[in-house]
A protein has these predicted regions:
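Helical hinge/lid and interdomain linker segments adjacent to catalytic or ligand-binding clefts
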Residues: 61-129, 250
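Catalytic domains of carbohydrate-active enzymes, especially glycoside hydrolases
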Residues: 82-85, 242-267, 351-352, 468-478, ...
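A glycine-rich, often tryptophan-bearing local segment used as a flexible ligand/cofactor-contacting loop or short
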Residues: 99-180
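Non-catalytic C-terminal accessory domains or segments of carbohydrate-active enzymes
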Residues: 213-216, 547-702
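Substrate-binding cleft/loops of secretory-pathway carbohydrate-active enzymes
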Residues: 367, 423-493, 523-526
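Substrate-binding cleft of secreted/luminal carbohydrate-active enzymes
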Residues: 473-490, 494-570
């Protein structure tokens, strides 16, 4: 807020305002909410004298926020998780006034002209807007209910005793203390702006108390500044057996999901009904511009394969069949078993129109390692014979008479080497499928063993042995967030990324898999990541890795879908330079946009009715007349360049590790790729399938 200065007439106005504010503050308290208009009538009289001091909203279209305190608390992490950027108050549109903030009637003009003001706790400024302590007894707050997910238990690790606040008439209560109903968060729209009030600070990390603050801001009209369309998500048809796949494909695309990794073991053996469902799912995804990967969980093959081949089942250290949790593990060291499984995998990859294959968790059980013999694998006869030939003893002795550390270390190292050879062997098998389908992308999902170093001994995972394969093979190394660190905060993702970057020069091939599930640890305020916690996780991960995958789409809660794509956007800079807006992003980004635009001085055809899509790097955007030609409304691939050629033609350059999918505003009629005429391969009326790699596309439409 700006100073009134030293002008004599301004001083008189300030004194008048002070007296009127004193009278206002002296009005008797009421126990029930009272109309905002009656409270603010006198303040609107003051406002007329203060119009000249209202800050000009010169940066209203920039996603800047300012915390009006030397101690910003967790607000930068909260607001930054959906792309808002911290800047000085003079250029910001969003303001956080922390507990004890001083009142100023200047705020009415700011809010009515578009500012968003967040009020934390009790203050004279909150009182000014009608959020004030009532005469009711304080309440002990330990649990909340929130309108965004009323049935979700929201439990605070440390309860607080808080006043019961009155809220102004017309305000919407978003969260209440679960038993008394006392308001904990509430919001109010004023003119073009809004007020969000919270009863207490949000917590050290920003999500300990009020998980849906960002959802409340969105309800009040705050639009996120960026969106990404690069997320991956895992999909298991067992949770979506009778759903409208067209509806869900549209929903996934709106949430920023670029690829679905579909549980392929359900279709390992041909079955008419299941195969028809999967074919329909793939077609629906392709129409919406979503890629579909076959997700394998070897050594689990399928229920039928397990039932049909008892002799090939994996064994635990107590010589029981390795049916562990939902996975029924097969002995892939056995050459007959391997040949049967590899033939089935090749057939499955060939039966459906996949865009890629994901080999996930291709190592051994379990997270408890040798401490739990009933879950420890592999202990089948083939592995035991191989190890005995090499080391001179049966590894089963490790769970009996041979308990020395040297022997134990010998087998654990052998086991990690076996897992690495198994991974390389299966990547080679998939290269055979790639010969028939050259556009297939390959992914190896591998649990983290750098951040949680115990994983190598527990399950045989050793990233340092696997990552050199990137020197000779083309695949994405998808790092799975291990269950042992699910309770840690989002700051772990930059740390994980740093450790893996030290192991390989192929940083663009590193991705991270976030498990969005109920955690077994004692975590607060929700058992599953949701709201601000989820957005912080996704945002930190997107800023640290080339790709972010979510396990799994069915576990994502409905309130999270609207802001998920914004949390996944990684933008380092946005600023005005004259009439242009400069945006710098790591992997390309979408920005809210209506009407035509120029990007870097050229008419830009890559936009839909609401979003303009930019390539990675810095780009200057400015308004322009709407181009008459076709538009590239969606691209599942990395956009490198685009230009409007004429009223019927556009040209763009893309790069993709898999097949790419492009959706246009008009029906394609003629296609040239790298200067060569090609027959359009359509997945929908205006949806085009494009080859893997980097290519220049020239498209003529009707």
């Amino acid at each position: 807020m700006r100073s009134l200065g030293s002008n004599h007439s301004l001083t008189v106005v300030a004194r008048m305002a002070s007296l009127m504010l004193r009278d206002f503050a002296a009005e008797p308290r009421q126990s029930e909410p009272r109309p905002l208009g009656s409270d603010l009538r006198v303040l609107r009289q003051i406002l007329a004298s203060f119009v000249v001091f209202a800050c000009v909203a010169c940066a209203a279209d920039l996603p800047y926020f300012s915390v009006l305190s030397d101690d910003a608390g967790a607000w930068p992490e909260i607001l930054g998780s959906i792309g808002l950027q911290r800047q000085p108050a003079g250029v910001s549109r969003i303001f956080v006034a922390r507990t004890g903030a001083a009142a100023s009637v200047e705020w009415f003009a700011r809010v009515e002209r578009g500012a968003v003001l967040i009020l934390e706790g009790e203050s004279s400024l909150a009182d000014l807007f009608g959020f004030r302590r009532s005469r009711k007894d304080p309440v002990r707050v330990q649990s909340l209910s929130d309108v965004h997910h009323p049935t979700l238990p929201i439990v605070w690790e440390k309860g607080l005793e808080l006043p019961v606040f009155e809220i102004p008439e017309g305000a919407q209560v978003f969260a209440r203390e679960r038993w008394s109903g006392a308001p904990m968060t509430a919001g109010l729209k004023l003119g073009s702006g809004a007020i969000l009030w919270v009863a207490a600070p949000p917590g050290e990390r920003g999500y300990e108390r009020f998980p849906y603050l960002l959802n409340a801001l969105a309800d009040l009209g705050l639009d996120p500044p960026f969106r990404s369309n690069r997320l991956w998500a895992f999909f298991d048809s067992a949770y979506r057996t009778r759903v409208d796949v067209d509806y869900f494909a549209t929903r996934w695309r709106k949430a920023g999901i670029a690829a679905l990794h579909v549980a392929a073991w359900h279709n390992f053996e041909p079955e008419p009904e299941g195969d028809a469902y999967l074919k329909k799912l793939i077609e629906a995804c392709h129409r919406e511009g979503i890629l579909v990967y076959a997700w394998f969980e070897l050594p689990h093959v399928s229920e039928k394969f397990w039932a049909d081949h008892p002799a090939w089942r994996e064994q635990t250290a107590v010589l029981q069949d390795a049916q562990l949790d939902w996975r029924k593990l097969m002995n892939l060291t056995n050459r007959e078993c391997f040949r049967a499984v590899s033939a089935g995998v090749r057939a499955l990859v060939g039966r459906f129109d996949w865009d890629g294959v994901n080999l996930a968790e291709l190592y051994f059980e379990s997270l408890e390692g040798m401490a739990n013999p009933s879950r420890f694998t592999p202990m089948n006869a083939d592995v035991r014979a191989l190890f005995q030939q090499e080391a001179g003893f049966d590894p089963r002795e490790l769970f009996g008479t041979r308990a020395d550390e040297a022997s134990r270390r010998m087998f654990l190292d052998f086991r990690a080497g076996l897992a690495r050879r198994m991974q390389e062997e299966w990547l080679a098998e998939l290269d055979i499928s790639r010969r028939a389908k050259p556009d297939l992308d390959l992914v190896l999902t591998h649990v983290d063993d750098r951040f949680d170093t115990g994983m190598r001994d527990s399950i045989g995972a050793d990233a340092a042995r696997v990552l050199p394969l990137l020197d000779t093979r083309s695949f994405t190394f998808l790092i799975e967030d291990p269950a042992t660190v699910w309770h840690l905060g989002p700051e772990r993702y930059p740390a994980i990324a740093e450790r893996y970057r030290a192991l390989t020069p192929h940083k663009d091939k590193l991705a991270i898999d976030l498990n969005i599930v109920e955690r077994y640890q004692n975590v607060y305020p929700t058992k599953q990541q949701t709201g601000t916690e989820l957005f912080q996780l996704v945002h930190r991960a997107a800023g640290s890795f080339a790709r972010v995958a979510l396990y799994f789409e069915n576990s994502l809660l409905p309130p999270d879908l609207k802001l998920l794509a914004s949390a996944a956007a990684a933008v380092s800079r946005i600023e005005h330079m004259g009439p242009k807006t400069v945006i710098d992003s790591a992997a390309g980004v979408g920005i809210p946009w209506k009407g035509g635009a120029k990007v870097d001085g050229e008419l830009w055809p890559a936009q839909d009715d609401e979003t303009l899509w930019l390539p990675a790097g810095p780009h200057a955007i400015e308004p322009a007349p709407q181009a008459a030609g076709p538009r590239l409304v969606h691209l599942n691939g990395d956009l490198k360049a685009a230009r409007a050629v004429d009223a019927k033609t556009l040209e763009f350059t893309y790069q993709s590790a898999s097949r790419a999918i492009a959706i246009f505003s008009r029906v394609p009629v003629k296609l040239r790729i790298d200067g060569v005429d090609e027959a359009p391969q359509l997945a929908g009326p205006a949806t085009l399938l494009l080859p893997r790699g980097q290519h220049v596309v020239t498209l003529a439409t009707d």
